[in-house]
């Protein structure tokens, strides 16, 4: 979009209407040229040079036609972008159905969550873990993602600011309400088989959901998670939460470790011992709290792996196999 720097002119769309999805621009200093990257959930990135003001394509740099054909040949069900409710608030979401989907049956759900203000999961864009999500859907699950309040999406000031000092509270509330509304809208969703998983901030929200709403979420996989917000780095945490000294109650309410005694379902904790972003002490402190409260869980630690848990031969495959195995064993797949 573009708008005049001065005056009250209308905002005008620049990106082509026929290209539904996400657009990125690397502008020239004069503003007359740009490297334009376009993609959506089923279209790999198309990169061309465009001229302004007409947004005219003057040179194709990469069309990724082969990748697009290969993806289409897989015959996967596309992501469906939908709306769900959290009270009076409308949330964006998507779902992926298995290729042998039968609308007369009820399917278990795996929710992919991030939930923190630094990013967003509901985007019509190429990648974002799509092939892994498709793989799990075709094991017999409905894979979904719901964008809660505060996520990094263009929904206005109040949407972004409302979670200040409250990171971790509104997000788990919205995830809980959102998935229950989705189950009401779509009879093929089995509300008795709901799983949730996330990495980093998403791992934290997985824990908050499992601990705070144990009647809604039955199985969770939390990866590289922050258990206590006081342990995370100041430049991120204090940006959204103020300081622990000024907002002790917010830090307490937003930290999963506060609610560990609420665990009722199946929980897998995964963390790299060499995580220099979310330090491993988060995992150790949560484990001690769960043990103290007599809560049963499963834990996988990857020695000297970082926050991404992808170092050393075989790690990524082992991690994904571990996750798939846990889902299949603890959240029975398939329509019933």
Where are these predicted regions, by residue range?
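Serine-hydrolase catalytic core recognition
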Residues: 15-16, 22-336
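Long hydrophobic alpha-helices with heptad-repeat/coiled-coil character
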Residues: 1, 11-12, 224
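Short beta-strand segments and strand-loop junctions that repeat across beta-rich extracellular domains
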Residues: 1-3, 210
